[in-house]
């Protein structure tokens, strides 16, 4: 298993609404400076912040499956399907853009914080489907706790969110002195963003490597293996993991660096 750790300097950045919304982008759009341009069907990952409030006006989407996952504050959504919704901390909004939809969004703080993540299904097939939108509150997501680790399943498995693209997503909190182990099978990639605190990651039997808050970790597996994440210090660790296939059996959108 191969491990790569990318600090914020190797991630992209962006802003909206005159700087009211700022973004750190582990996987950005073309030209936004991220060292990682895509990971299989994981096309885009932005970590947005708004100290007070920020607005992004109506704009179109097609084909992609777009998840908004709220860390803090509130996310407002409106679209051309006639939908209006608000989601708070721990909640999520999912757009499956299909043949096309327009939407607008607002982040409301103080200190609003969320992820927007794009997954790429087979675009040709997706364009034949009607667009859909769904919202989920924090209490709808299952959590399991064991030996100082809390794992919330956001996409896949027991979660209410299932998408067409092959992907799983988890929000993991690790107490000081505890560790979380994630198994990876061949042709699988794990993308990890350290949301709160730092820690150590070891891939299989390799020596553990340290990472800091806001670092982006990428692990690729060519055979069965496991990655271990341990908290460092006295404040614990929170990170979000997304697992996708390293390669898919359909053509992907040609994304430039």
Predicted regions and their residues:
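Jelly-roll (double-stranded beta-helix
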Residues: 1-257
